[in-house]
Amino acid sequence: MSTIVKICGLTTADTLEAAVETGADMVGFVFFPASPRHLDIDFADALGRQVRSRAAKVALTVDADDDLLDAIVEQLRPNWLQFHGSESPERVRSIKRIYGLPVMKAIAVAGPEDLSVLPDYAAVADRILFDARPPKDATRPGGLGAAFDWKLLDGVNLKLPFLVSGGINAGNVAEALRVTRAQGVDVSSGVETSPGEKDPDLIRDFIRAARAA
Protein backbone atom coordinates (compact mmCIF):
# COMPACT_ATOMS: atom_id res chain seq x y z
CA MET A 1 0.00 0.00 0.00
CA SER A 2 1.28 3.45 -0.90
CA THR A 3 2.10 5.76 2.00
CA ILE A 4 -0.81 7.99 2.97
CA VAL A 5 0.33 11.62 2.87
CA LYS A 6 -1.73 14.29 4.60
CA ILE A 7 -0.94 18.00 4.57
CA CYS A 8 -2.80 19.69 7.40
CA GLY A 9 -3.62 23.28 8.22
CA LEU A 10 -3.75 24.64 4.68
CA THR A 11 -4.91 28.24 4.51
CA THR A 12 -4.14 29.57 1.02
CA ALA A 13 -4.94 28.64 -2.55
CA ASP A 14 -1.31 28.36 -3.63
CA THR A 15 -0.25 26.05 -0.82
CA LEU A 16 -3.34 23.92 -1.31
CA GLU A 17 -2.53 23.64 -5.00
CA ALA A 18 1.05 22.65 -4.21
CA ALA A 19 -0.29 19.85 -2.03
CA VAL A 20 -2.81 18.41 -4.44
CA GLU A 21 -0.74 18.79 -7.60
CA THR A 22 2.18 16.97 -5.97
CA GLY A 23 -0.06 14.11 -4.93
CA ALA A 24 -1.17 14.56 -1.33
CA ASP A 25 -3.83 12.01 -0.46
CA MET A 26 -5.49 14.15 2.19
CA VAL A 27 -5.66 17.90 2.81
CA GLY A 28 -6.67 19.22 6.20
CA PHE A 29 -8.61 22.32 7.17
CA VAL A 30 -8.49 23.41 10.81
CA PHE A 31 -11.54 24.72 12.66
CA PHE A 32 -10.10 25.73 16.02
CA PRO A 33 -9.73 29.45 16.85
CA ALA A 34 -6.61 28.99 19.01
CA SER A 35 -4.70 27.67 16.00
CA PRO A 36 -2.85 29.99 13.60
CA ARG A 37 -4.26 27.74 10.87
CA HIS A 38 -7.90 28.28 11.82
CA LEU A 39 -10.31 28.94 8.96
CA ASP A 40 -13.84 30.20 8.86
CA ILE A 41 -16.19 27.82 7.11
CA ASP A 42 -16.87 30.07 4.11
CA PHE A 43 -13.19 30.33 3.24
CA ALA A 44 -12.63 26.63 3.86
CA ASP A 45 -15.50 25.93 1.49
CA ALA A 46 -13.81 28.02 -1.22
CA LEU A 47 -10.57 26.10 -0.75
CA GLY A 48 -12.49 22.84 -0.74
CA ARG A 49 -13.99 23.62 -4.12
CA GLN A 50 -10.45 24.06 -5.44
CA VAL A 51 -9.61 20.53 -4.32
CA ARG A 52 -12.41 19.00 -6.38
CA SER A 53 -11.85 15.23 -6.26
CA ARG A 54 -8.05 15.33 -6.34
CA ALA A 55 -7.60 14.62 -2.62
CA ALA A 56 -9.70 13.81 0.41
CA LYS A 57 -10.85 16.85 2.38
CA VAL A 58 -10.36 16.51 6.13
CA ALA A 59 -12.07 18.76 8.67
CA LEU A 60 -10.03 18.96 11.89
CA THR A 61 -11.82 20.00 15.06
CA VAL A 62 -11.03 20.02 18.77
CA ASP A 63 -13.92 19.01 21.04
CA ALA A 64 -16.37 20.61 18.62
CA ASP A 65 -20.04 20.88 19.50
CA ASP A 66 -22.83 19.59 17.29
CA ASP A 67 -23.63 23.00 15.82
CA LEU A 68 -20.10 23.47 14.50
CA LEU A 69 -19.96 19.95 13.11
CA ASP A 70 -23.35 20.43 11.45
CA ALA A 71 -22.13 23.60 9.73
CA ILE A 72 -18.84 22.05 8.62
CA VAL A 73 -20.43 18.93 7.19
CA GLU A 74 -23.23 20.83 5.47
CA GLN A 75 -21.04 23.46 3.81
CA LEU A 76 -17.60 21.93 3.36
CA ARG A 77 -18.81 18.39 2.69
CA PRO A 78 -15.58 16.83 3.96
CA ASN A 79 -14.54 13.30 3.15
CA TRP A 80 -13.15 12.79 6.67
CA LEU A 81 -13.55 14.20 10.15
CA GLN A 82 -10.45 14.43 12.34
CA PHE A 83 -10.78 14.80 16.09
CA HIS A 84 -7.80 16.27 17.88
CA GLY A 85 -9.25 16.86 21.34
CA SER A 86 -10.49 14.77 24.24
CA GLU A 87 -13.44 13.30 22.36
CA SER A 88 -14.43 10.02 23.99
CA PRO A 89 -14.82 6.76 22.07
CA GLU A 90 -18.56 7.09 22.63
CA ARG A 91 -18.51 10.56 21.08
CA VAL A 92 -16.58 9.26 18.07
CA ARG A 93 -19.08 6.44 17.60
CA SER A 94 -22.04 8.82 17.89
CA ILE A 95 -20.67 11.30 15.35
CA LYS A 96 -19.89 8.55 12.86
CA ARG A 97 -23.48 7.38 13.16
CA ILE A 98 -24.89 10.89 12.73
CA TYR A 99 -22.87 11.96 9.69
CA GLY A 100 -21.89 8.69 8.06
CA LEU A 101 -18.33 9.94 7.62
CA PRO A 102 -15.06 8.18 8.49
CA VAL A 103 -13.20 9.53 11.51
CA MET A 104 -9.50 9.84 12.22
CA LYS A 105 -8.80 10.18 15.94
CA ALA A 106 -5.59 11.75 17.21
CA ILE A 107 -3.89 10.19 20.21
CA ALA A 108 -1.34 12.35 22.02
CA VAL A 109 1.81 10.43 22.91
CA ALA A 110 4.57 11.23 25.39
CA GLY A 111 5.09 7.87 27.07
CA PRO A 112 3.90 4.26 26.89
CA GLU A 113 1.02 4.97 29.25
CA ASP A 114 -0.61 7.14 26.58
CA LEU A 115 -1.19 4.07 24.43
CA SER A 116 -3.55 2.52 26.99
CA VAL A 117 -6.53 4.22 25.31
CA LEU A 118 -5.66 2.78 21.91
CA PRO A 119 -7.93 -0.31 21.97
CA ASP A 120 -11.01 1.77 22.79
CA TYR A 121 -10.40 4.26 19.99
CA ALA A 122 -9.29 1.64 17.49
CA ALA A 123 -12.66 -0.03 17.98
CA VAL A 124 -14.58 3.02 16.76
CA ALA A 125 -12.26 5.14 14.57
CA ASP A 126 -11.37 4.46 10.94
CA ARG A 127 -7.80 5.71 11.30
CA ILE A 128 -5.59 6.61 14.23
CA LEU A 129 -3.14 9.53 14.23
CA PHE A 130 -0.31 9.41 16.74
CA ASP A 131 0.90 12.92 17.57
CA ALA A 132 3.24 14.34 20.19
CA ARG A 133 1.57 15.26 23.47
CA PRO A 134 1.80 19.06 23.84
CA PRO A 135 3.26 20.78 26.91
CA LYS A 136 0.81 21.42 29.75
CA ASP A 137 0.83 25.16 29.03
CA ALA A 138 0.09 24.75 25.30
CA THR A 139 -3.00 26.46 23.91
CA ARG A 140 -3.55 23.93 21.14
CA PRO A 141 -3.15 20.16 20.91
CA GLY A 142 -1.03 19.90 17.78
CA GLY A 143 0.92 21.68 15.07
CA LEU A 144 3.68 22.60 17.52
CA GLY A 145 6.61 21.02 15.70
CA ALA A 146 7.40 18.65 18.57
CA ALA A 147 8.16 14.97 18.03
CA PHE A 148 7.59 11.99 20.30
CA ASP A 149 9.75 8.91 20.65
CA TRP A 150 8.72 6.92 17.59
CA LYS A 151 10.03 3.73 19.18
CA LEU A 152 7.04 3.85 21.52
CA LEU A 153 4.97 2.52 18.62
CA ASP A 154 7.10 -0.59 18.35
CA GLY A 155 4.75 -3.51 18.75
CA VAL A 156 1.60 -1.53 17.98
CA ASN A 157 -0.55 -3.85 15.88
CA LEU A 158 -3.73 -2.31 14.54
CA LYS A 159 -6.24 -3.67 12.07
CA LEU A 160 -6.80 -0.15 10.76
CA PRO A 161 -4.29 2.24 9.18
CA PHE A 162 -2.43 4.66 11.41
CA LEU A 163 -0.52 7.85 10.70
CA VAL A 164 2.22 9.63 12.62
CA SER A 165 2.67 13.34 13.13
CA GLY A 166 4.67 15.78 15.19
CA GLY A 167 8.08 17.19 14.33
CA ILE A 168 8.16 15.47 10.94
CA ASN A 169 9.62 17.16 7.87
CA ALA A 170 11.18 16.22 4.54
CA GLY A 171 14.48 15.45 6.24
CA ASN A 172 13.18 12.86 8.70
CA VAL A 173 9.97 11.50 7.19
CA ALA A 174 11.70 8.39 5.86
CA GLU A 175 13.06 7.61 9.32
CA ALA A 176 9.66 8.23 10.92
CA LEU A 177 8.04 5.75 8.57
CA ARG A 178 10.80 3.19 9.02
CA VAL A 179 10.75 3.27 12.82
CA THR A 180 6.99 3.40 13.31
CA ARG A 181 5.96 1.28 10.33
CA ALA A 182 3.05 3.68 9.96
CA GLN A 183 0.85 3.58 6.91
CA GLY A 184 0.96 7.34 6.59
CA VAL A 185 2.26 10.71 7.75
CA ASP A 186 0.56 13.97 8.63
CA VAL A 187 2.51 17.22 8.47
CA SER A 188 1.71 20.81 9.36
CA SER A 189 4.50 22.84 10.96
CA GLY A 190 7.11 20.77 9.11
CA VAL A 191 6.20 22.55 5.87
CA GLU A 192 5.99 26.05 7.34
CA THR A 193 8.34 29.02 7.52
CA SER A 194 6.50 30.37 10.59
CA PRO A 195 3.39 29.21 12.48
CA GLY A 196 0.52 29.03 10.02
CA GLU A 197 2.64 30.14 7.04
CA LYS A 198 3.11 27.17 4.74
CA ASP A 199 5.62 27.16 1.90
CA PRO A 200 4.70 25.55 -1.45
CA ASP A 201 8.25 24.30 -2.04
CA LEU A 202 8.44 22.73 1.42
CA ILE A 203 5.12 21.00 0.76
CA ARG A 204 6.37 19.59 -2.53
CA ASP A 205 9.65 18.47 -0.96
CA PHE A 206 7.83 16.72 1.87
CA ILE A 207 5.45 14.82 -0.38
CA ARG A 208 8.27 13.69 -2.64
CA ALA A 209 10.35 12.57 0.35
CA ALA A 210 7.43 10.63 1.79
CA ARG A 211 6.79 8.94 -1.53
CA ALA A 212 10.45 8.00 -1.88
CA ALA A 213 10.68 6.53 1.63
From Swiss-Prot:
Per UniProt, the enzyme's principal EC class comes to isomerase
Name a GO molecular-function annotation: phosphoribosylanthranilate isomerase activity
Q: Could you tell me the EC number(s) of this protein?
A: 5.3.1.24
Q: Which domain of life is it from?
A: Bacteria
Q: Which reaction does it catalyse?
A: N-(5-phospho-beta-D-ribosyl)anthranilate = 1-(2-carboxyphenylamino)-1-deoxy-D-ribulose 5-phosphate
Q: Which UniProt keywords apply?
A: Amino-acid biosynthesis, Aromatic amino acid biosynthesis, Isomerase, Tryptophan biosynthesis
Question: Per the UniProt entry, what is one GO biological process?
Answer: L-tryptophan biosynthetic process
- SUPFAM superfamilies (alphabetical): Ribulose-phoshate binding barrel (SSF51366)
- Pathway where this protein functions: Amino-acid biosynthesis; L-tryptophan biosynthesis; L-tryptophan from chorismate: step 3/5
InterPro entries listed in its UniProt record: Aldolase_TIM (IPR013785), PRAI_dom (IPR001240), RibuloseP-bd_barrel (IPR011060), TrpF_fam (IPR044643)
The family database entries (Pfam families) matched by this protein are listed as:
PRAI (PF00697)
Q: Which family is this sequence assigned to?
A: Belongs to the TrpF family.
Name the record gives this protein: N-(5'-phosphoribosyl)anthranilate isomerase
Which species is this UniProt entry from? Rhodopseudomonas palustris (strain TIE-1)
